[in-house]
Amino acid sequence: MILLEVNNRIIEETLALKFENAAAGNKPEAVEVTFADFDGVLYHISNPNGDKTKVMVSISLKFYKELQAHGADELLKRVYGSFLVNPESGYNVSLLYDLENLPASKDSIVHQAGMLKRNCFASVFEKYFQFQEEGKEGENRAVIHYRDDETMYVESKKDRVTVVFSTVFKDDDDVVIGKVFMQEFKEGRRASHTAPQVLFSHREPPLELKDTDAAVGDNIGYITFVLFPRHTNATARDNTINLIHTFRDYLHYHIKCSKAYIHTRMRAKTSDFLKVLNRARPDAEKKEMKTITRKTFSST
């Protein structure tokens, strides 16, 4: 299985090139790039007001207001410091870099810029991991509508944090492959007792979402992660956040890859069958033809 990159490579490569050229004393060039990411996220890299010595990185998330309710603004201030500026129009967060005043730790700064989406997501997880660490119970469940028709729920208890993703499968094939995929996670936990518990429910929401407006339907699935203190403590939580916030994309990416692989194998097998059939086909009988005088000749 393939782990999706947590960082955004386009941001990192663009900023790294800009920093490298600036450090070499090269004349700055204009940049204007707009590109998308998973979960309807949109990025914009540009020169604000046409100033080529400044590079702005902006991100738009449809669900950012829900993240703000869980401390997203405070977390971003802590991570990005003075690079965080007022967001440009149409975006939720903007970072500004001055090519005439390069930071000392350029590699670290570039990497953190590439982690912008992850860091926006991180606030809700850090908040509930902290609740669990402090033994708080009864806090309201976090509800993040991270896609138009899909939702993430986060809830903390004294001994665990429960994260539930709802997801929509486009067709019956996706449901079948998704079930097989989730079964592999259950098998994986048997091999590693330190892995979190992973549960999958189809059509109906899990008990954790009882008496909520969670969606119900033949194409609806729910993936539940039960995270224990070994997954949420201060040393492990960053890696946990890195992995869990991309899980929905990871699942659907592998469903698409599986369907493409099956389709490729079917085409290859069909081609092999056709070759066998062509070899087994009998040669056409040669028809003997004669002239009016009964002499034989062959047609060409």
From Swiss-Prot:
Any one annotated GO CC term: Arp2/3 protein complex
Residues with N6-acetyllysine modification: 275, 295
Entry GO MF terms: actin filament binding; AP-1 adaptor complex binding; Arp2/3 complex binding; ATPase binding; glutamate receptor binding; kinesin binding; protein-containing complex binding; structural constituent of cytoskeleton
GO biological process terms on file: actin filament polymerization; Arp2/3 complex-mediated actin nucleation; cellular response to epidermal growth factor stimulus; cellular response to hydrogen peroxide; cellular response to nerve growth factor stimulus; cellular response to platelet-derived growth factor stimulus; cellular response to rapamycin; intracellular signal transduction
Keywords: Acetylation, Actin-binding, Cell projection, Cytoplasm, Cytoskeleton, Nucleus, Synapse, Synaptosome
Membrane in keyword set: no
Keyword Nucleus: yes
Subcellular location, record wording: Cytoplasm, Cytoskeleton; Cell projection; Synapse, Synaptosome; Nucleus
InterPro entries: ARPC2, ARPC2/4
Protein family (similarity comment): Belongs to the ARPC2 family.
PANTHER family per the UniProt record, alphabetical: ACTIN-RELATED PROTEIN 2_3 COMPLEX SUBUNIT 2, ARP2/3 COMPLEX 34 KDA SUBUNIT
Description of how the protein assembles with itself and partners: Component of the Arp2/3 complex composed of ACTR2/ARP2, ACTR3/ARP3, ARPC1B/p41-ARC, ARPC2/p34-ARC, ARPC3/p21-ARC, ARPC4/p20-ARC and ARPC5/p16-ARC. Interacts with SHANK3; the interaction probably mediates the association of SHANK3 with the Arp2/3 complex.
Described purpose of this protein according to its UniProt entry: Actin-binding component of the Arp2/3 complex, a multiprotein complex that mediates actin polymerization upon stimulation by nucleation-promoting factor (NPF). The Arp2/3 complex mediates the formation of branched actin networks in the cytoplasm, providing the force for cell motility. Seems to contact the mother actin filament. In addition to its role in the cytoplasmic cytoskeleton, the Arp2/3 complex also promotes actin polymerization in the nucleus, thereby regulating gene transcription and repair of damaged DNA.
The protein's name in its UniProt record: Actin-related protein 2/3 complex subunit 2
